[in-house]
Every structure is written in C-alpha cells, then in structure tokens.
C-alpha cells in the first residue's frame, strides 16, 4: 500500500506528518527507497504481513530539509526513529548520480542544498 503524506505541521518537538490512510499497526522498517520517476522518497513500514510505502513527495522535501534536527511523527503516533539516517544515506547516493535521472538529481540537490 502507498501512503502519501499530504500535510505537515511543525511543532517544537517535531515534524508532524499526516496521511489520509491509517498507519495504525504499522512499524518502521528503517529503510528508504527512491521513486525517481514520481519524485518521491518511500519509507518502508511493516504490519507484520506486508510492507507499506510512506511516500514523501517533492512538495514535502523543503520542510524535511529545514527541520532535519526534529523528530518525524506520523499521524500523531508513529515516530520514525531511523528516518533521518536513511534520508542522509539516500541523499549521499543521489548526489551527482545521474542514474536516478538528471532532472530528479538536480531537484534533490537543489532542495537539500547538496550542490
């Protein structure tokens, strides 16, 4: 299942991300994938039987970048403890790597100030 983050609220203690789909019963896997065709980052969640993809589309990237030091909390209950580590890993792989597509790499480098 693809779960799209469609709202982000900043609070003192974290970045609160919300989706229309429920994330109850899901736990983080601690792995992020790249969807360069659709300009998104997909963070893996697991319900014990199957994986779901928590999708952060391009419109969310600047908020993630500007608040890198804050906790990421999904639907007020699920803290993504390995999110920042995984995002950093993915960003390091994307930087200068046109295998992801030149336009995607350029967008990531610009938003996350990798240039």
Swiss-Prot record:
One Pfam family linked to the record: UPF0738
Kindly provide the name given to this protein in its UniProt entry. Answer: UPF0738 protein SE_0694
According to the entry, what is the taxonomic lineage of the organism? Answer: Bacteria, Bacillati, Bacillota, Bacilli, Bacillales
The family annotation for this protein states: Belongs to the UPF0738 family.
